[in-house]
Structures are given as C-alpha cells and as structure tokens.
Amino acid sequence: MQEALALFFGSESLLVGTIIPFLFVLTVVVFVHEMGHYLVARWCGIGAQAFSIGFGPELLGFTDRHGTRWKLSAIPLVGYVKFIGDESETSSPVGVNESALSEEDRKRAFHTQPVWKRAATVFAGPAFNIILTIAIFSVFFALYGRQIADPLIAGVQPGSPAAEAGFEPGDRFVSVEGEKITTFADVQRIVSGRAGDKLNFTVERDGKMVDLQAVPKIVERTDPLGNKVKLGAIGVETTEAVGNFRRIEYGPLESVGQAVIETGHIIGRTGEFFKRFAVGREDKCQLGGPVKIATMASKAASQGFDWLIQLMAMLSIGIGLLNLFPLPPLDGGHLVFYAVEAIKGSPVSGAAQEIFYRIGFLLVMGFMGFVLFNDLFAC
C-alpha cells in the first residue's frame, strides 16, 4: 500500500512529479491568455457571460457582480471567454439572434461593437501571452543577469564547416548575415536555426575584415532539461580564457529592455523554424504536443521552481504565436475576418466564414494529431 501511495503521491510520482507541474504551467498560461481577452473586452465595454479555465462540465465557480460566471471546468487543457452575443464559432455578427438579446445586452454584445474593438479583444489574448514572457524574462534578467562571452574563436573543429570555410583561432565575429555580433551567443543564436543555409560571416583577423561563407550542419545536442535537440553549427568554440566569460547585471529598466529583445529573438526564430518546416527543412520531432510539454514540465520541476517558470515563459510565447496563425478557429483567423471587414466595410458572409472555419478546423485538428503522434509514436 505504501509503495502504491509513493508511486502516485511521492515527489517523483506521476501526480506530483508530472501532472501537477504540467497543469500549473498550462493553467497559468491559459489564464493569462483568456484574461487578455477579458480585460480588453471590459475596457471596450463588451460584456462577458463566462470565463472558464478548461472546458466540459463545471467543477466549481461563482458569478461576479457584472454577471460573469467564473469557473473551473473538468478538462483543463484550454480556456475560453464567452461574450454577450458571441454565439458563433467565428465570433462574427453574422447569424446572431438579435431577438434573444435585451436592449442593454445589445449595447454590450460582442458583435455590435466596432470592428477595431472586436479585433483588439481578440488580439489581446496572444498579446498577454507575449507580455507574460517578457515579464518573466525581466525578472530573471534582474535577478541573475546574463552570462556572456566575447565573440572570439578559441578553436575550430577539424573537418567542420568552419574549417572548410577558412575560420581560424583568434578570429573575432563582427557580423553574421549583416547582423552585428557583440557576444558569442549572438553567433550561436543565428547559426542554430539555419542548418543547410549558406551564411555570410565577417570576422576581424589581425586588424583586417575578412568575409567568409559557411553552411551550418545539423548536430544533436542535449539541452539543460535532458531533451535531444537538433541545431545548426559550424564547428567553432570559445573558452573562458579567450572569450572572457563574465556576468552582466541589469537594472529594472535594462532588464525589461533585455527581455523585450530576447522575446523578439524567440519570435524571429519561431518564424524561421516554421518557414523552414513548411518546406521540409526542419526535424518534425522538434514539434511536440501535450505529452512532450508534460515531460518537459516534469524535468523542469525536478531542476527547481525557476526552471518551471522559464518553461512557462517559453510555453506562453509559443501559445501566443500559435494563436496568431491565420486559421479561423484561432485568434489569427478571427483577425483575418476583421481585417477583411474593415477593408470592405461589411462582415465576411456567413457562408464564406463557415467554409473557412471548417477548413481551418480540419487543419488545426490535423496539426494537433501530428504533434500527438510525434509525442506517442514517432519521436
């Protein structure tokens, strides 16, 4: 009996070691996303009927003085905010039953608002996810600073792309693909996502600028959480003596600035990844679903609470960006409809919305099935 309890409730058990960290991270990210929708809707004068974390049967909840039902539902993988008059899947004014709404409800209904208010409300969810990531990074930069190294080459691996391109120990990176380089991590950031691409490098050698070209090759590395990841590399390294390893400390405003820059880099790398993935140039196993996220949450929790919060930051921006994909079931799909409405002066027809919604729904379900298959069988 004790062994059974330890298996389920012990610190390394399925419940405590995996399920609780996973639900903690996911619930916070989903809550922030939906809170973005809710707060901006309130600021725009839109009424909310329900705010739910999860879907399915309600487990517990309460109704506030504004008439909004706040609830925790049985399946805590997603969340939603149900606005007054928001009856259709596409959150459009087409097909809404006006007679079912009172005069007061019509004033506060989602579909009666100007298109910019509806667009702002929809965009706020992904935006709040990105803001959460920036906030977490800001705290970490303020507390821990950043470890950096000068962009100096200490060694070149024989037979590597760098060796074939003519890189030499002592070279200092000046730019990669026209982007100015200030730390060795800048080089790693650019090169890691460009395996197979011919990249242009400028290095300083003996006081002179030298232009070189190299094609990063794919290498498999183990990240701090023990995950196998495939990255681009050219085969150069630095050392503490050559690279002058050091920690930079940041004040509050500097921390926010660094967090914004880091978040921008992540957005850029994510866009580059999906662009390459669409043409078959990225490893499909780099995409994971709930099983992979749960595994990562378990590993992060075992490393410490700060690791779990870092995972939350990465998951938050991932969900924010995913929701901006221009497919109708997602926030990005709604924004496309609103953009068309703003341009032509009237909503997209109900028939057209229905067609695009069905296509988008199938694509989203296909993507979810793909990543789940990766989780369970392929990777």
Curated annotation (Swiss-Prot):
Is Cell membrane set as a keyword in this record?
yes
**Cofactor requirement:** Zn(2+)
Report which superkingdom the organism of origin falls in: Bacteria
* Gene3D superfamilies (UniProt xref): 2.30.42.10
Instruction: Give the matching PROSITE patterns.
Output: PDZ, ZINC_PROTEASE
Picking any one GO molecular function of the record gives:
metal ion binding
InterPro entries in alphabetical order: PDZ, PDZ_6, PDZ_sf, Pept_M50_Zn, Peptidase_M50
Q: What is this protein called?
A: Putative zinc metalloprotease BMEI0829
Q: Which organism is it from?
A: Brucella melitensis biotype 1 (strain ATCC 23456 / CCUG 17765 / NCTC 10094 / 16M)
